[in-house]
């Protein structure tokens, strides 16, 4: 959906929720393929199932339905005798077209500079946010997406400089700042990964999509799959790989894994390699596509393994690694003076796992209307990119994120905890390419996590 249409919906949200007669809209929404029948059933079950709750969820989900979603919704209102609301939205669209400057973009990037990360001299950067402002040395930049993508109660745990690192590499050597061996021995400071194998790892790799989906072949993804299959076996996981699953089969595979008995194991990992998109959410943003072109929200995937869905994983770390686009924006970054040689230009073999909305509405996004995990714990969801932005994949070497994650795990998993490893991944990936990419994560782990490497 265009930013102007999205803003208009949000400005009119209170009135729409108050006056919208949703019961009369279902057939019209189906006939115009704005939503599938399953999606409408999810909307009807939102909250208490009241008209207001349904209207509220409908307006929220409408933002994910493509560039033509709002004009089609307006025509649905006209066909169901809700002309007053249709006129309200139509006049708002016309006003925005006549005066585009009146609509302040919500996707304006906000550069946020975090403190020193203990980088080596070669990795140090000088970040210049504004030509009129003095440069700031030895800082690591993070480009955050739209503020509204991160609910106030759920600020993502991305690159937190205040978190103690188990190994300080500031001068190129290891210093006993926070010795991993000492932390590993304390159950109140680090998760216990004593079992061997330490847990299951499910890798879902979607490469070939049906022609009707409009989604391209994800050349290079098999390289990502093979790297992570090898890496997590090395980390003492029992790895299972599923290739080219439809959305329904993805959910089935995840639920089958959740129904297993994990009581004798200490950890659990899910890796999903696919195309992705934005999706309405309460906690975890984004969605991934099955090979049939239907999507499954990350929130739904995570909630399959919550306390009620998988009690045998209660209190144990559950890790989700998502290699997929969070949207269609390409991040050009901002000016940096960098001494690192890690950057590389974007060539013809690099392509995004993005799904543009320019083809009109798709009956795709399946949304989890009601979250069953209000206070998530022992969960970490690592995204290859921030919501709203593309995630780059090289046809010859695989995705930037997975290639870097594999290398960091190989080099540092013996000595550093997971959060420190992900900081390294974010720093390395952000240095790549003409277009920029910055991984991030939602971290609800209660302790440090050190992988089992021997």
Curated annotation (Swiss-Prot):
Q: What is its EC number?
A: 3.4.22.62
Task: Tell me which residues bear Phosphoserine.
Answer: 340, 348
Under the heading PROSITE patterns, the entry gives: CARD, CASPASE_CYS, CASPASE_HIS, CASPASE_P10, CASPASE_P20
Keywords from the named record:
Apoptosis, Hydrolase, Phosphoprotein, Protease, Thiol protease, Ubl conjugation, Zymogen
List the catalysed reactions. Strict requirement for an Asp residue at position P1 and with a marked preference for His at position P2. It has a preferred cleavage sequence of Leu-Gly-His-Asp-|-Xaa
Ranges where the CARD domain occurs: 1-92
Q: Which domain of life is it from?
A: Eukaryota
Q: Which residues form the active site?
A: 275, 325
Q: What is this protein called?
A: Caspase-9
Query: What organism does the record attribute this protein to?
Result: Mus musculus (Mouse)
**Protein's gene:** Casp9
């Amino acid at each position: 959906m265009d930013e102007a249409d999205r803003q208009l919906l949000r400005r009119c949200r209170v009135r729409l929720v108050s006056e919208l007669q949703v019961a009369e809209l279902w057939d019209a929404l189906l006939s115009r393929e704005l939503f599938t029948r399953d999606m409408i059933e999810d909307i009807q079950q939102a909250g208490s199932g009241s008209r207001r709750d349904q209207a509220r969820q409908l307006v929220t989900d409408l933002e994910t339905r493509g560039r033509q979603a709002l004009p089609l919704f307006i025509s649905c209102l006209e066909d169901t005798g809700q002309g007053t609301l249709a006129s309200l939205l139509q006049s708002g669209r016309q006003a925005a077209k006549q005066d585009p400057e009146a609509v302040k973009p919500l996707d304006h990037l906000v550069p946020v500079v975090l403190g020193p990360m203990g980088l080596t001299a070669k990795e140090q950067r000088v970040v210049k946010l504004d030509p009129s402002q003095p440069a700031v040395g030895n800082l690591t930049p993070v480009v955050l997406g739209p503020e509204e993508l991160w609910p106030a109660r759920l600020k993502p745990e991305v690159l937190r400089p205040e978190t103690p690192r188990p190994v300080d590499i500031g001068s190129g050597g290891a210093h006993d700042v926070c010795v991993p061996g000492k932390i590993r021995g304390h159950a109140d400071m680090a998760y216990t990964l004593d079992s061997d194998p330490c847990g299951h790892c499910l890798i879902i790799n979607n490469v070939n999509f049906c022609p009707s989906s409009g989604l391209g072949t994800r050349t290079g993804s098999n390289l990502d799959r093979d790297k992570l299959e090898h890496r997590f076996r090395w980390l003492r996981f029992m790895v299972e790989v599923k290739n080219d699953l439809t959305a329904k089969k993805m959910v089935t595979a995840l639920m089958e894994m959740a129904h297993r008995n994990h009581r004798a194991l200490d950890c659990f990992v899910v890796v999903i390699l696919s195309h992705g998109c934005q999706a309405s959410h309460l906690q975890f943003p984004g969605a991934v596509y099955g090979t049939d072109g239907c999507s499954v929200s990350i929130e739904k995937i995570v909630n399959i393994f919550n306390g009620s869905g998988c009690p045998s994983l209660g209190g144990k770390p559950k890790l989700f690694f998502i290699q997929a686009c969070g949207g269609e924006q390409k991040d050009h970054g901002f000016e940096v003076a960098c001494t690192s040689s890690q950057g590389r230009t974007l060539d013809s073999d690099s392509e995004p796992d993005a799904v543009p909305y320019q083809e009109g509405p798709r009956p795709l996004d399946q949304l989890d209307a009601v979250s069953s995990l209000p206070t998530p714990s022992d969960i970490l969801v690592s995204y290859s990119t921030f919501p709203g932005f593309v995630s780059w994949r090289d046809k010859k070497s695989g995705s930037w994120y997975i290639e870097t994650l594999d290398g960091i795990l190989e080099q540092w998993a013996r000595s550093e905890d997971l959060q420190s490893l992900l900081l390294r991944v974010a720093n390395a990936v952000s240095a790549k390419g003409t277009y920029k990419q910055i991984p991030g994560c939602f971290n609800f782990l209660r302790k440090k996590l050190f992988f089992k490497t021997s």
